[in-house]
């Protein structure tokens, strides 16, 4: 019995080792033949590949039995299969494999195309915008539909191509952001791509019906989802393309988007969701190698650390290799400049470090960050997971700071509870965020809201933010917790002018804290337009009427956009705000004594070789103006009373500075 167990263990390890000598090249095309390879159990009764004419519907043109050779199931089909579609079938339902690079509508079948024909003109000359340090990044998180669906002059509303249009590029460049974090843009399962465009539906339905049968016309309601429902990880989402039926279209248009942003000096960061799949039964992982890619609990149930019904097992050799190859593929094929790992706390540390190491070998400037938490208990030791507390073991990888987020606006658990902006004593938590979650002698860790000890080795390992797609946007949160707590159904547009002015003051103050902190600044798209979602806490499948950006706000509240723009410029022009090194932060950043509700700090002695010798930032959340003692000197104010001007607004002399209620003061000498 012992010999049998050892033999089976040896065979299993040999299978994985042999399979790992291959990349996930499940389909290799040439005009003479096409070769298929699949990682699937050696003891599978039957593994087949089916060839189809269409991406959806119709019977298979060919069905070929695959043979098990050297740890993989393989088959070769002679002849030119360009333009055909294929699926794998091992008795659990057909699927396009786990590493399809092109698919038909809804991702049910993989497509055989020539990838070189999906490159836009001059693609070979496309280059990543220069980024010397993650501290130099200004990350702008956006959803394709949110950004462009309500823009009157947009030609490609809700599509990849919207980000190639001049209005979009001009807005982003003027604002000053230099990295776009796009919400999931791989092929996901929660939007039916056949019901996006009634004309396309009619055209393709007509082609698939018997001669003489005319399909009924159909009008489709708009569909919306954030896309955290992975199906095909390595193919762009079809609903963001102009034709989801044509496999090459989504690929070409995604590349055109990247190319346009790169020409504008803007990096592209992909939101990747390797921690779970849309479901288990229908997933490509499960249909090719049942239960291998998922974690299970001690009692045999599927673990649910993602909160979505399952969690993948990144520590298993082939899941780890899948993640490594997928990241590399997006970098090589689509020129992606960074990756945001959804629920990074579900992934093991070793896999994350191997990804960082691999990426460094290609381009060390590619930025990696993620959520340093999970959404439930993972079936893996917490000390080995990519949690925020373990960031010191993952150098070169950053995590979101819920400390600074919740210090500013209030706890995630209750939208009606305020934070520092609403008068709560969270000064130490805010200080912890300002230094970038590193060890600093003036931060009293016992008073920090969540972290028991510093979790970042370098400040560039902390994402500084006050809002993102999750939870309420900043305007809604301020409405619910500070401005109009007594009437939770009211909306920003219904406020009187006095309350609107107060909300705007707090909004600008919050972002000043974010953009003058030493972490990597991150903002939700539309915050520069006073975006609101009508109070919706979780808008993942809410309609466009909730999620769209209201572009008319740019004209209604020009002072808000101007402040955001000038705040970003201030950070970009002055290295003191982005030192990028923990020792430099401890050397040059000193907190000043300040009254309750105020946080003040001094960036001293030409920090980061800044042109300004001393910079003092005073953040006042209280409803009264406050006095703060400062080093005696002659100062120029560049931020005061909701206005920023680097050339100077006024001068101050002496050893005291007065900052207006609910505002920031930035001065220098």
Can you describe what each PLM-predicted range is?
Residues 38, 142, 182, 261, ...:
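Conserved, mostly hydrophobic/aromatic
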Residues 38, 43-56, 60, 625-642:
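Beta-strand-rich binding/interaction modules
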Residues 145-166, 170-178, 183-334, 347-362, ...:
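Substrate-binding/active-site clefts of carbohydrate-active enzymes
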């Amino acid at each position: 019995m012992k010999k049998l167990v050892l033999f089976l263990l040896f065979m299993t390890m040999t299978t994985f080792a042999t399979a790992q000598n291959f990349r996930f090249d499940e389909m290799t095309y040439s005009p003479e033949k096409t070769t298929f390879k699949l990682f699937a159990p050696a003891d599978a009764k039957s593994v087949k590949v089916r060839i189809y004419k269409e991406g959806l519907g119709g019977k298979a043109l060919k069905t070929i039995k695959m043979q098990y050779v050297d740890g993989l199931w393989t088959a070769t089909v002679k002849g030119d299969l360009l333009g055909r579609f294929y699926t794998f079938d091992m008795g659990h339902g057909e699927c396009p494999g786990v590493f399809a690079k092109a698919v038909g509508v809804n991702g049910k079948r993989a497509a055989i195309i020539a990838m070189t024909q999906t490159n836009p003109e001059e693609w070979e000359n496309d280059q990543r915008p220069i980024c010397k340090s993650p501290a130099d990044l200004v990350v702008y998180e956006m959803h394709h539909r949110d950004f462009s669906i309500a823009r009157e002059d947009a030609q490609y509303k809700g599509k990849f191509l919207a980000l190639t249009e001049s209005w979009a590029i001009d807005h982003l460049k003027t604002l000053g952001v230099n990295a776009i974090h796009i919400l999931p843009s791989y092929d996901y399962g929660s939007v039916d791509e056949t019901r996006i465009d009634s004309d396309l539906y009619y055209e393709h339905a007509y082609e698939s019906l018997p001669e003489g049968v005319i399909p009924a016309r159909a009008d489709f309601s708009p569909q919306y989802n954030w896309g955290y429902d992975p199906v095909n990880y390595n193919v762009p989402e079809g609903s963001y393309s102009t034709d989801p039926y044509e496999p090459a279209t989504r690929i070409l248009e995604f590349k055109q988007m990247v190319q346009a942003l790169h020409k504008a000096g803007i990096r592209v960061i992909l939101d990747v969701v390797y921690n779970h799949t849309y479901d288990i039964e229908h997933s490509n992982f499960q249909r090719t190698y049942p239960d291998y890619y998922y974690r299970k609990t001690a009692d045999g149930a599927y673990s649910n650390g993602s909160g979505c019904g399952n969690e993948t097992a990144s520590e298993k050799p082939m899941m780890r290799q899948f993640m490594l190859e997928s990241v590399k593929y997006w970098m090589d094929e689509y020129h992606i400049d960074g990756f945001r790992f959804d629920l990074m706390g579900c992934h093991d540390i070793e896999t994350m470090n191997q990804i960082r190491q691999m990426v460094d070998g290609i381009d060390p400037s590619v930025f990696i960050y993620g959520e340093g938490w999970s959404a439930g208990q993972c079936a893996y030791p917490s000390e080995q997971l990519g949690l925020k507390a373990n960031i010191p073991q993952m150098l070169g990888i950053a995590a979101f700071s819920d400390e600074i987020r919740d210090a500013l606006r209030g706890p995630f658990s209750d939208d009606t509870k305020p934070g520092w902006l609403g008068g709560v004593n969270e000064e130490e938590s805010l200080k912890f965020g300002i230094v970038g979650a590193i060890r600093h002698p003036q931060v009293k860790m016992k008073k920090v809201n969540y972290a028991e000890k510093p979790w970042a080795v370098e400040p560039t390992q902390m994402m500084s933010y006050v809002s993102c797609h999750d939870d309420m946007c900043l305007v809604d949160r301020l409405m619910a917790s500070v401005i109009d707590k007594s009437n939770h159904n009211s909306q920003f547009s219904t406020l009187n002018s006095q309350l609107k002015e107060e909300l705007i003051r707090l909004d600008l103050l919050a972002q000043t804290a974010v953009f003058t902190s030493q972490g990597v600044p991150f903002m939700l798209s539309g915050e520069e337009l006073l975006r609101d979602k009508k109070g919706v806490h979780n808008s993942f499948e809410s309609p466009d009427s909730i999620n769209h950006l209201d572009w008319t706000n740019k004209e209604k509240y020009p002072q808000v956009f101007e402040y955001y723009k000038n705040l970003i410029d201030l950070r970009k022009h002055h290295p003191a705000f982005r030192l990028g090194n923990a020792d430099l932060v401890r050397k040059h950043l000193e907190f000043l004594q300040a009254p309750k509700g105020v946080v003040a700090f001094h960036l001293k002695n030409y920090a980061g070789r800044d042109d300004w010798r001393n910079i003092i930032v005073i953040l006042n959340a209280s409803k009264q103006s406050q006095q703060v003692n400062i080093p005696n000197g002659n100062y120029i104010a560049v931020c005061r009373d909701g206005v920023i001007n680097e050339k100077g607004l006024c001068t101050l002399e002496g050893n005291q500075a007065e900052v207006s209620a609910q505002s920031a003061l930035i001065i220098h000498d």
